[in-house]
């Protein structure tokens, strides 16, 4: 599926005059994290990459916190760190610290949106393009199930019940 998306994007870019070279790397190498390999996602020696990361749950903090300056992989930390876009903004780092101290859900959501905008529309460090959908199902005799794209399938298991037939 990933290669199909890449081919489509390459075609779109070609239509507007942008040349693109696709490089296919075995997933075990790309996601392997071998500090000696030039082809890991931590190093990523290219101008743009496609990845399918998203956070699970209603709490954006763990996902956003991956983008602080100190999480940028590089030779000084043996290519460890989750900030593979290497986005670095001290204001964003300060927001991560601030977010960890906020309890009110509405205030957390507001700051989370601000931080998301910093990563996306304000800096283009991350450009959301496609959400790869997931397939979920449940028995017709099970009520109260509320599936969503942002949490595990059993996030509201306490609300489930058997439907009387």
Segment roles from a protein language model:
Residues 9, 16-18, 137:
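Hydrophobic aliphatic residue packing
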Residues 4, 8, 78, 113-115, ...:
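Residue-level detector of functional hotspots within protein domains
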Residues 14-75, 111-112:
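Periplasmic binding protein-like
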Residues 10, 14, 31, 96, ...:
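Generic hydrophobic alpha-helical scaffold/packing signal
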Residues 35-44, 65-97, 101, 130-165:
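Short, solvent-exposed loop/beta-turn-alpha elements that line the ligand-binding surface or hinge
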Residues 41-52, 100-140:
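Bilobed periplasmic-binding protein-like "clamshell/Venus-flytrap" ligand-binding domains
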Residues 1-11, 124:
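Bilobed "Venus flytrap"/periplasmic-binding protein-like clamshell domains
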Residues 2-6, 24-27, 84-92, 101, ...:
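Solvent-exposed, acidic/flexible segments
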């Amino acid at each position: 599926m990933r290669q199909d998306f890449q081919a489509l994007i390459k075609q779109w870019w070609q239509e507007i005059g942008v040349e693109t070279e696709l490089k296919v790397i075995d997933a075990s190498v790309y996601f392997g994290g071998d500090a000696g390999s030039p082809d890991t996602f931590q190093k990523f020696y290219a101008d743009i990459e496609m990845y399918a990361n998203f956070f699970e749950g209603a709490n954006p903090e763990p996902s956003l916190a991956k983008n602080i300056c100190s999480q940028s992989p590089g030779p000084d930390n043996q290519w460890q760190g989750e900030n593979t876009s290497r986005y670095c903004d001290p204001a964003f780092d300060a927001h991560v610290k601030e977010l960890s101290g906020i309890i009110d859900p509405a205030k957390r959501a507001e700051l989370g949106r601000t931080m998301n905008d910093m990563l996306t529309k304000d800096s283009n460090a991350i450009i959301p393009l496609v959400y790869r959908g997931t397939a979920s199902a449940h028995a017709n005799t099970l009520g109260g199930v509320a599936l969503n794209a942002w949490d595990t399938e059993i996030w509201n298991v306490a609300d489930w019940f058997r439907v009387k037939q």
